Amino acid sequence: MAYFLDFDERALKEWRKLGSTVREQLKKKLVEVLESPRIEANKLRGMPDCYKIKLRSSGYRLVYQVIDEKVVVFVISVGKRERSEVYSEAVKRIL
């Protein structure tokens, strides 16, 4: 079952600021995630139903939450991994 994609409005602003190559790389991974969103290796501890997509070469991370009741993959935060900012922003946004 394919999931739908939705963005937190702050995450959408972050998405729009990304360079085109980074955005294209994340798009490819998001297409895979929409088919099978619960990837255990990418599960985030301490954040219920949250997972990450990581681009190792550029250091970018995308944090998303799977909402089964609505069949939605909800993007919470997008950004560089530096000082774990992308993760701390995600925690603030889901609480």
Swiss-Prot record:
InterPro entries tied to this protein: RelE/ParE_toxin, RelE/ParE_toxin_dom_sf
GO cellular component entries: protein-DNA complex; toxin-antitoxin complex
Cited Gene3D superfamilies: RelE-like
Site feature: Transition state stabilizer: 54, 61
Enzyme class: hydrolase
Inducers of expression: By amino acid starvation, by glucose starvation and by chloramphenicol; induction is independent of ppGpp. Autorepressed by RelB, RelE acts as a corepressor. Member of the relBEF operon. Operon induced by ectopic expression of toxins HicA, HipA, MazF, MqsR and itself, but not by YafQ.
UniProt keyword list: Antibiotic resistance, Endonuclease, Hydrolase, Nuclease, Repressor, RNA-binding, rRNA-binding, Stress response, Toxin-antitoxin system, Transcription, Transcription regulation
Listed EC numbers: 3.1.-.-
Residue numbers annotated as active site: 52 (proton acceptor), 81 (proton donor)
Consequence when changing residue 61 to A: Reduces mRNA cleavage rate constant 2700000-fold
Domain of life: Bacteria
GO MF term set: DNA-binding transcription repressor activity; endonuclease activity; ribosome binding; RNA endonuclease activity; rRNA binding; toxin sequestering activity; transcription cis-regulatory region binding
Annotated knockout phenotype: Cells missing relBE have a higher steady-state level of translation during amino acid starvation than wild-type cells. They survive antibiotic treatment in log phase better than wild-type cells. Cells missing mazE-mazF survive hydroxyurea treatment better than wild-type; further disruption of relE-relB and tonB yields even better survival.
Biological processes, Gene Ontology terms: cellular response to amino acid starvation; mRNA catabolic process; negative regulation of translation; regulation of DNA-templated transcription; regulation of growth; response to antibiotic; single-species biofilm formation
Subunit structure of this chain's protein: Forms an RelB(2)-RelE(2) heterotetramer. Also forms an RelB(2)-RelE heterotrimer. The RelB(2)-RelE complex is probably the one that binds DNA and represses transcription, possibly as 2 heterotrimers, 1 bound to each of 2 operators. RelE occupies the A site of the 70S ribosome, making extensive contacts with the 16S rRNA. Its presence blocks access of tRNAs and translation factors. RelB bound to RelE prevents RelE from entering the ribosomal A site and thus inhibits its endonuclease activity.
Family indicated by similarity: Belongs to the RelE toxin family.
Additional information: There are estimated to be 550-1100 RelB and 50-100 RelE molecules in rapidly growing cells of MG1655; as they have quite high affinity for each other (dissociation constant of 0.33 nM) there is probably less than 1 free RelE molecule per cell. The RelB(2)-RelE complex has a half-life of over 70 minutes.
Summary of the function given for this chain in its UniProt record: Toxic component of a type II toxin-antitoxin (TA) system. A sequence-specific, ribosome-dependent mRNA endoribonuclease that inhibits translation during amino acid starvation (the stringent response). In vitro acts by cleaving mRNA with high codon specificity in the ribosomal A site between positions 2 and 3. The stop codon UAG is cleaved at a fast rate while UAA and UGA are cleaved with intermediate and slow rates. In vitro mRNA cleavage can also occur in the ribosomal E site after peptide release from peptidyl-tRNA in the P site as well as on free 30S subunits.
Protein name according to UniProt: mRNA interferase toxin RelE
Naturally occurring in which organism (per UniProt): Escherichia coli (strain K12)
Lineage of the organism: Bacteria, Pseudomonadati, Pseudomonadota, Gammaproteobacteria, Enterobacterales
